[in-house]
Amino acid sequence: CGNVLHVHDLADNVTTESERAGAAAAAYALGGGAETDAVADTGCELTVSPAGIAGYALPGRITAVALTKLNFRVRRPVDAACVRILADGEELFAGKVRAFKPSVMESFPLPAKVIQRALDLGVSKIVLSVDPVEEA
């Protein structure tokens, strides 16, 4: 899980992340590597970058083809926006349109099949973009 320091708005987020960090540290100390939920895949090395109104995205790197929880915050409030996952300009996933606020740490479950699709495209970076949409 790496070294992590960022502000959470809920104690639940702090607890969950600290438990994950502790499990990863224990696995690493026992020689099992840093991955706890999935085995690191030597062929999987994806950088995660924010775009649109997303200020940042965590984790910044994905090393396993497994369901991965992405956390992010938006830079400004918006009533209608959509989370999109892009690889080399191609949209791999689009979420439902909904409201976002900068004060809320958002999370997004990135399915393993989306990670695999990015790897199949031969990219080393995916983009988590939160894009405002015009309501009709």
Question: Can you say where each PLM-predicted feature lies in the sequence?
Answer:
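Residues forming the flavin
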Residues: 1-136
